[in-house]
Structure formats: structure tokens, C-alpha cells
């Protein structure tokens, strides 16, 4: 992915997340601000920040590895989105008590701003990034090549990964030099 696309994507994630929380707050008012909901803020569970960090690291690692494996397996590529969605649904149920289930720094930051809740914010930046980078490295060591890393292959949109999947190209996309 070109640096400009990555930068724009990151900024858009944070701005979009914040806009979504603020719009929801405008529509739901006191219900979203209620202490029991507190803007859906993501905070470590009662087991603490270490457990929350490990939970976020593990879920991010497994999700990224699953996306890389399915999206780079020709027969499974069309199921990449389903695999990612199913894993995320399972994570919401199983992992939420430990970290609140984020896997996305923009999601956590966007809720933290109106809630003014910053406890453990660092781990929601460090753990998902570390887990996904580690998954990428494990994939490269295990399979050697990455052809594509996107969730949805069957569309006519520009591919920011330049993988050539939409053109039938079989050249690998290199994740790490």
C-alpha cells in the first residue's frame, strides 16, 4: 500500500470513528453518555492491563493470520470476509470481558475522547499493531509470499494493495523487505 493511502486511511479511520460516536451522541444523548454505556469506551477488564494486552494481541494475531491465509488461497479468497466476520463475532463474545474487544486503535480512541477515559489507551495502540505485524511475519516465514491482503476481492474498485488480484496477476505482494 502506498504511504499516502496508508496515511489517508489511518486519518479517515480516526475521524470517521469520532464522527460516528459524536453523531450517535447527538442522536441518543443521555443514553450513550450514561455511566453504564459511557460512549462504548474500551477499557481493560477486571483482570488488568496485562491480560487486556495479551487478549488484544492474540485476537489481532489470529485475525490477521486468518485473513492472510484465506485471502492468499485462491479457493478460499472469496470467504475471507466471512472468516474475518465470524472471528470478530466470536471475539466480541469471548474476549470482551478481558479488554472490551477493540482490535482497532481508532475505535478505542473515538470512544475515549467524549468519555474522557484514557485508562489503558496505550495497549489498544500497541497490542493490535504488534499482533498483526507478528502475524504478517509468521505468514511470510511459513508461506513466503503474500498475493493479497484484502477482505473482498470481487469488486471493480481500485486495489490500494496493487496486488493484481483483480487483473489475474500471480505476482506476490511483499509485506516486508
Q: How should each PLM-predicted stretch be described?
A:
Residues 1-177:
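Membrane-interface helix-loop junctions and terminal tails of multi-pass membrane proteins
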